[in-house]
Regions:
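Catalytic and substrate-binding regions of cell-wall glycan-acting enzymes that process beta-1,4-linked
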Residues: 12-70
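Flexible, glycine-rich surface segments
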Residues: 1-14
Length: 70
């Protein structure tokens, strides 16, 4: 349920949803404003919370692996 709310709030943008789940939706809104105009990869690289940055990278790496291999 919570992930569905985040998906709606962030227009199904997976990196933003993952970052919001781990680091809080308000923080993601601030980061998206700060890094407006950058692509998703650059957004992820600029996440200032070390834990959230690592979390998003790990989940996206797994997501792409399974998407490409299964």
């Amino acid at each position: 349920f919570y992930l569905m709310k985040l998906m709606k709030r962030f227009d199904n943008n997976i990196p933003s949803v993952l970052a919001a789940y781990n680091g809080g939706p308000h923080n993601v809104e601030l980061w998206r404003e700060r890094f407006a105009g950058v692509d998703d990869d650059e957004f992820v690289e600029n996440i200032p919370f070390k834990e959230t940055h690592g979390y998003v990278k790990r989940i996206l790496r797994s997501y792409h692996y399974y998407k490409n291999n299964y």
